Amino acid sequence: MKTLMIDMDNCITDALFMKRINEFLGTDYKLEDQTEFRLQKITGDRINEFWQFMKDKSFYDDAPLIKGAYKALEILNKKYDLYIITAFIYPNSNPDISSNNLKFKYEYLKKKLPFISPKQYIFIENKNLIHSDIAIDDKITHLNNSEKKILLTAWHNKNIRDEELNEKGIVRVNTWDEILELLDY
């Protein structure tokens, strides 16, 4: 059976990162207006205050699954050796934030995707340490160690040119229906 690695944030769920930044700053930034992958950079020189603000908060409390993800994951889980792979350590945050984030991600996955066993979760900072037959991610640098590379469009990768993706052997998709079609469903 082929291995399929699927990123959690921005592929399975719309984490509430922007919502938490807006709560902290008292702003109304929109995710679709952003191009930077590391949204926490918006906080500027208040980054340490932001991480303290986030110490006991989750990015996942009411975070929705991305449209079509539940159905697609149910189908793909029967056909592939499927794993959800996700980072839980945020750059420039203290260790308490990362350990809480690990707990919040674990709880979210168990609640929202009960048909996927916790044995199928991989929590890791460097995703390129893991090889898979197929990978689905929103960041091209996380697709290096897979045979079939699928980039799910997100705010921070929408400006990557098709030529660059083609050179790297990456196929762009916009929806979970397109992923199922690409994987012959």
Feature-to-residue mapping (PLM):
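Short, solvent-exposed loop/turn segments at secondary-structure junctions
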Residues: 11-13, 18-19, 87-92, 127-129, ...
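Substrate-recognition element of Asp-dependent hydrolases with the DxDx(T/V) motif
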Residues: 60, 64, 69-102, 109
